[in-house]
Design a protein with these regions (language model features):
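Glycine/proline-enriched, intrinsically flexible loops and inter-domain linkers
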Residues: 1-96
């Protein structure tokens, strides 16, 4: 960033990060509560992450299992290769 106007101040950054983390946490809980699988419902064996348009991790739910996050890289690459030019703002991809 060449210009100080392009930089995000730390307070605003923290507010945005916490907002995104709250969204991920709410998605985690919603999936857990609505699941039929005991692995998800009782063992919490699932993960939620928010990625940017390049597939980089922005935030993950607090209870997310890191092993699941590690596998999202390959999945994201495949999604971007298949749908990249057709992905629009607000699109969501869910994978198992």
């Amino acid at each position: 960033m060449s210009n100080s106007a392009d930089q995000l101040d730390p307070i605003r950054l923290e507010i945005i990060a916490n907002g995104l983390r709250s969204i991920a946490d709410e998605c985690f809980i919603a999936l857990m509560r609505s699941a039929y699988s005991t692995n998800i419902k009782e063992r919490k064996d699932h993960s939620i992450a928010i990625l940017d348009k390049r597939g980089r991790l922005v935030v993950q739910a607090a209870l997310t299992l890191p092993i699941h996050i590690a596998s999202m890289g390959g999945l994201t690459t495949c999604v971007l290769e298949k749908y990249g030019v057709n992905i629009n703002e607000g699109d969501i991809f869910i994978a198992n």
